[in-house]
Amino acid sequence: MQKATYYDSSAIYGAYPYQGANGFTYNASQQQYPPSSSLVETEYHRPACSLQSPGSAVSHHKANDISESCMRTLPSQPLQPPGLTDPQAPPQPPPAPQAQPPPPSSASPSQNASSNPAPANSTKSPALNSPTVSKQIFPWMKESRQNTKQKNSSSSSGESCAGDKSPPGQTSSKRARTAYTSAQLVELEKEFHFNRYLCRPRRVEMANLLNLTERQIKIWFQNRRMKYKKDQKGKGMMTSSGGQSPSRSPVPPAAGGYLNSMHSLVNSVPYEPQSPPPFNKPHQNTYGIPASYTAPLNNCPPPQKRYTGTAAVTPEYDTHPLQGNGYGNPHIQGSPVYVGGNYVETMTNSGPSIFGLTHLSHPPSANMDYSGAGPMGNNHHHGPCDPHPTYTDLTAHHPSQGRIQEAPKLTHL
């Protein structure tokens, strides 16, 4: 069936400009293409991609914008309509030496009118619309036309075949969801309780027992392991967040003795829980030693707090009641430091930097979280009550008293 009766004279026969009655003129420097006498105004050769009647001027512009394949083979044409960028259209064969005679005028207006409301199809197969062109072009267009028909028919038939085959094939497809019975689920859960990973003989045995395939059992165990891992992760987060709050889990009494033996401090005194717990903030890195203990301060003034050391060197300081040799970095906020068995949360307000002997007094509101359970001696607080304030650390060896000779090296923070 012929879809259209016009072909692009400016595309294939670019040397012959024409002027239509609707006001569209292709201006070229060569002689004008002589129109056929039988076709007066409606039978000028239109572009192959434009299927419009002569009266549709706006759609004719759109067809000129769409059909790049009509203009692609003429790089030396003087005037091309702008915006012809269709990269998907194949190039035309070389132009014929003379124009083909147009079809009879009786069939062309009706076919033109029938093909008028379909300009979108012209972008897919621009050369399908001209059945009356030279033999160099016609087989290619016929082939492409048949190819599109074959593609459409094959895709529809493929869909129908896939639709026919998919219901029986869903049992073996990956996307199929296997419905397990309650008895099968009980057996699978029981097996998972004892063995999270099945060996192949046991898997074959269970497949025969439960009337399932090995693949189904393997995939069920994979999914069940992932679910188990997710559940364990959720439980671990819940217990860790709940167990680290100081009000929930008290420290067992053996923890004090263990830390005492680990520290081997000289003048250790028994601890008692303080009545007002200082800065009892639940932190997630306190490693399950959440209850706070303080040493008896022996009637010392409250601003003079004890500070614990962090490194392997533990010098003892001279009597300087509020000497600012703090072992807490004031710039690292909220990260607890493991110091001498105690988990001390570093200060969040301004203070002297690490090991800076700046002689600045620590403010009494420094957020020191004494959440460790290790006992410390009564000589481990400085102030006017004790002439030599001692700074304890993890290794707990005490060098001779005197002023500090060098700044201790910070090994882990």
UniProtKB/Swiss-Prot annotation:
PROSITE patterns: ANTENNAPEDIA, HOMEOBOX_1, HOMEOBOX_2. Coiled coil: none annotated. InterPro entries: DUF4074, HD, HD_metazoa, Homeobox_Antennapedia_CS, Homeobox_CS, Homeodomain-like_sf. A motif (Antp-type hexapeptide) lies at residues 137-142. Residues 168-177, 238-248 have a biased composition (Polar residues). The keyword S-adenosyl-L-methionine does not apply. It is found in: Nucleus. Residues 107-122 have a biased composition (Low complexity). Its main location: nucleus. Residues 72-131, 143-177, 230-252, 374-413 are annotated as: Disordered. SUPFAM superfamilies: Homeodomain-like. GO terms for biological process: anterior/posterior pattern specification; embryonic skeletal system morphogenesis; regulation of transcription by RNA polymerase II. Residues 88-106 have a biased composition (Pro residues). Residues 173-232 bind DNA. It comes from the Eukaryota. GO terms for cellular component: nucleus. One of its GO terms (molecular function) is DNA-binding transcription factor activity, RNA polymerase II-specific. Keywords: Developmental protein, DNA-binding, Homeobox, Nucleus, Transcription, Transcription regulation. Sequence-specific transcription factor which is part of a developmental regulatory system that provides cells with specific positional identities on the anterior-posterior axis. PANTHER family: HOMEOBOX PROTEIN HOX-A3, PROTEIN ZERKNUELLT 1-RELATED. Belongs to the Antp homeobox family. This is Homeobox protein Hox-A3. It comes from Gallus gallus (Chicken). The gene is HOXA3.
